[in-house]
Amino acid sequence: MSAQKPGLHPRNRHHHRYDLATLCQVTPELAQFLTRTPAGEQSVDFANPLAVKALNKALLAYFYQVANWDIPEGFLCPPVPGRADYIHHLADLLGETTGAIPADASVLDVGTGANCIYPLIGVHEYGWRFTGSEVHAQALASAQVIISGNPGLTRSIRLRRQKDPAAIFNGIIHKNEQYDATLCNPPFHDSAASARAGSERKRRNLGQDKNDALNFGGQQQELWCEGGEVAFIKTMIAESQAFGRQVMWFTTLVSRGENLPPLYRALTDVGAVKVVKKEMAQGQKQSRFIAWTFMDDDQRRRFMARKR
């Protein structure tokens, strides 16, 4: 019996250790990156960015039927189990309104990235429809290649270029559109130097030396922004007020618990009717997302009834 990973959502497909033999059958290129831990167990060389990408490719193919997936060099290669957790907890939040998880939810992914990870998981697990926004032209092109390369996804995922790098919802949510939820993995560093320091810490934790290759890729807009995570989410909160009748739940990951108090104050200032925090855990890593709405319980029920 393989050991379970602590803390993952009950519906997460990644509770058990990876079956590397099966994953290598699905994605043969993964085999060249297998290694042994000091305890003699087979593992993946997580210090190698090509190994991490091959693992992601295998996980997406095996668990989510994404046959064709790739990202350009230098873009974030996200851990699939943690991204899946956000989707499952979001599903629970949407299900609280009517007592059932909606099968046809419409979700906006802010900053979908070159990897398009949240829409890929959400479409497979729940049949939702996604709009992915992205400011980076190369990331948008990469995500479109993934969508076009997998039959069926073009009907479920559409992409929009955010032409104003200072905006989040403005220019993306159109006048008569409605979304059950938004989600976002915001840039969390406040400078390029801070982002580099974070990568150094991760590298040391993996036992890499300073000159080793990084698997912690990421373009500037993926890793940092002026003012860091708090400033980014405050902008999101400020913009959300104008779309409070078009979106039922606004949500975003928050990397550090100490960032919550100023965000809660900002939500009070814009008149959010309800604010929810969802705690998550992937192995030793603790994470969370916050959700807010400008609709009361009755308004949310009517919103979902109208959309259906």
From Swiss-Prot:
<feature type="region of interest" description="Disordered">
    <location>
        <begin position="190"/>
        <end position="212"/>
    </location>
</feature>
<dbReference type="GO" id="GO:0005737">
    <property type="term" value="C:cytoplasm"/>
</dbReference>
<dbReference type="InterPro" id="IPR016909">
    <property type="entry name" value="rRNA_lsu_MeTfrase_F"/>
</dbReference>
<comment type="similarity">
    <text>Belongs to the methyltransferase superfamily. METTL16/RlmF family.</text>
</comment>
<dbReference type="InterPro" id="IPR029063">
    <property type="entry name" value="SAM-dependent_MTases_sf"/>
</dbReference>
<comment type="function">
    <text>Specifically methylates the adenine in position 1618 of 23S rRNA.</text>
</comment>
<protein>
    <recommendedName>
        <fullName>Ribosomal RNA large subunit methyltransferase F</fullName>
        <ecNumber>2.1.1.181</ecNumber>
    </recommendedName>
</protein>
<keyword id="KW-0808">Transferase</keyword>
<dbReference type="InterPro" id="IPR010286">
    <property type="entry name" value="METTL16/RlmF"/>
</dbReference>
<keyword id="KW-0949">S-adenosyl-L-methionine</keyword>
<keyword id="KW-0963">Cytoplasm</keyword>
<dbReference type="GO" id="GO:0052907">
    <property type="term" value="F:23S rRNA (adenine(1618)-N(6))-methyltransferase activity"/>
</dbReference>
<keyword id="KW-0489">Methyltransferase</keyword>
<dbReference type="GO" id="GO:0070475">
    <property type="term" value="P:rRNA base methylation"/>
</dbReference>
<keyword id="KW-0698">rRNA processing</keyword>
<dbReference type="Pfam" id="PF05971">
    <property type="entry name" value="Methyltransf_10"/>
</dbReference>
